[in-house]
Regions:
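Phosphate/nucleotide-binding beta-alpha loop and adjacent structural elements of enzyme active sites
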Residues: 1-279
């Protein structure tokens, strides 16, 4: 039996059980494994996106970089983190990544020194103070060096296209205001965004979306949903922004004819089973 005939036979047999089979690198397979940051990055890769430089602003202990590196192993990685507590972990990580470097500083709209509120849990540390009362959430202020992303690009000689990730607890727009020149050569931006005004003078989801729209970027994907302990309301999420007229938005239709046919078939089978149970 020819291979093509065998494949058709296997697919036909699976469809009888309302099952489908896909290549691991197909668009459909990617869509079925989208949980977490790596899922977002794999989907971006499947679209043909290949960043020359990955900017990880607010690297913490290196979680994002460690997930991103296997997806884009040929990219240059530049990690920026102001907390010295993370330095040992970041040093170990960058030593294992052949094209990575870490700079211990905060990113802001201006160069100089800034006051960083070092939280007891470290991960929530921010240039902004939280509005929460009757807790020690804001921790202890610490003076740290601040640089702009544009100056970082110039100093390191980094080249685009860029993938920019920013997780800085409320200071995202400050970081972006210091990255105006770099944004011109950036295709994909991943921001952690809050749905509430957790930080004094900090932006919420709507503020960030409007700012990004004014810079020519729109929402493309989401991940990392977090819920606040207070009432279990959705509180923060990771939002991927892409150029409104760029690589990721060249097509605005929903599916190919083959994909639409396969989806219709699955829906019809599901409805037939549902109707059969109600007879």
């Amino acid at each position: 039996m020819e291979l093509a005939s065998l494949k058709r036979g296997i697919r036909a047999m699976l469809r009888r059980f309302n099952l489908e089979i896909y290549r691991l690198d197909s668009a459909t397979a990617v869509s079925l494994s989208r949980s977490g940051i790596e899922g977002l990055l794999r989907q971006a890769q499947s679209m043909g996106f290949v960043p020359t430089t990955v900017m990880d602003i607010g690297a913490a202990y290196g979680s994002f970089a460690s997930q991103c590196f296997p997806v884009f192993p040929k990219a240059q990685f530049i990690l920026l983190e102001p907390l010295v507590e993370y330095q040992p972990a970041l040093r170990k990580l960058t030593e294992a990544m052949s094209t990575a470097q870490c700079i211990m500083a905060a990113a802001s709209a201006h160069q100089g020194e800034v006051s960083l509120n070092v939280h007891p849990d470290l991960v929530g540390s921010s240039l902004f103070r939280e509005v929460e009362k009757d807790t020690n959430v804001n921790g202890v202020p610490r003076t740290v060096c601040a640089i702009t992303v544009d100056s970082l690009v110039k100093e390191t000689g980094a080249r685009g296209p860029f993938l920019l990730k920013v997780d800085v607890q409320g200071a995202e727009l400050d970081v972006l205001r210091g990255a105006e020149r770099m944004l011109a050569d950036t295709e994909y931006i991943l921001l952690e965004v809050s749905l509430f005004k957790f930080f004094q003078d900090g932006p919420d989801f709507n503020d960030v979306v409007l700012y990004m729209k004014s810079r020519g970027f729109v929402i493309y994907d989401i991940s990392g949903l977090q819920y606040r302990p207070l009432d279990n309301a959705l509180s923060q999420l990771d939002v991927a922004f892409v150029r409104e007229d760029g690589l990721f938005r060249r097509r605005h239709y929903y599916a190919t004819s083959e994909q639409r046919e396969a989806q219709n078939r699955r829906i019809r089978i599901h409805l037939e089973e549902l109707f059969a149970r109600t007879r």
